[in-house]
Amino acid sequence: MDQDALISKEDSEVEREASGGRESLSDVIGFLDAVLSSEPTDIGGDRSWLHNTINTLQRPGSTHRVKGEGEGEVSTSSTQDNRSGEESRVSGGTSEPEAEAHARNVDKQNIHWATGRGASTDSVPQDLGNGRDSGILEDPPNEGGYPRSGAEDENREMAANPDKRGEDQAEGLPEEIRRSAPLPDEREGRADNNGRGVEPGSPHSARVTGVLVIPSPELEEAVLQRNKRRPANSGSRSLTPVVVPSTRSPPPDHDNSTRSPPRKPPTTQDEHTNPRNTPAVRIKDRRPPTGTRSAPDRPTDGYPTHPSPETDATKKGA
């Protein structure tokens, strides 16, 4: 009797192993039939069946068929843990409050988003633009009267007047040159920066921080061409050398032998009255005209002199 029971049990296990693949497919079909044949009121009342997992890969002997009232055969797993069944029942009982809470949270988020956008809760689609610049917000009105930054004003002016962009393109200059600061002059930089004239000075930008821009050769060439067109600074001193006549060298073809001798300075009365400091000046003899005889006691210069002993001797000998 026991051997017959064991043989029949082994045969049933072999049959189940052979038909394992067909049973998994039939289980899914049976579950779908049960769902489609159930009424909507039953689905709304109990949703625990939604949380039951479908195990298509099951070992043989782990499934059995259950026939319910007014329903087809539904295959359920006999190896399911009781804990999973309890969790499914608990989740099925609490699924409806969770769905309501989720719906309320979604409504609150929609209300908060619509309030922040300044529109009503009914009008969910928002106006994102006129089609040309969709997604680009217009400039907010300057209600507080605060001064705007120069870059914003220039960008706004460039957007309002597209002719300036055409002027830049006509001149062959990129748009960055119009907004960039001119390069400082080397001489002005030495005077202003205490000798640091080669250091570039650029204005601070609040929107661009920590970005090192490497200029291209074309951009540098355009900037140099623009700086050349600037008017010269009238306050800068000219660096032309002053020619001194005394230090001027003669031309190479000049002959030194033909140079005129330096002129003597005119003599003054001090040279005669101060013989110590000035050289002696030769004075011509004043001879009387022929036929006249000067007085022996009167010299040629007109001043009377006393006779010396030699003069007396010559007179006596004569």
From Swiss-Prot:
Record keyword Methyltransferase present: no
Source organism superkingdom: Viruses
Biased composition (Basic and acidic residues): 7-20, 99-110, 150-168, 175-193
Region named Disordered: 1-23, 54-318
Keyword Ribonucleoprotein attributed: no
Signal peptide feature range: none
Keywords of this entry: Phosphoprotein
Residue(s) carrying Phosphoserine: S249, S257, S260
Anything else known: The P/V/C gene has two overlapping open reading frames. One encodes the P/V/W proteins and the other the C/Y proteins.
Protein name per UniProt: Protein W
Organism: Sendai virus (strain Ohita)
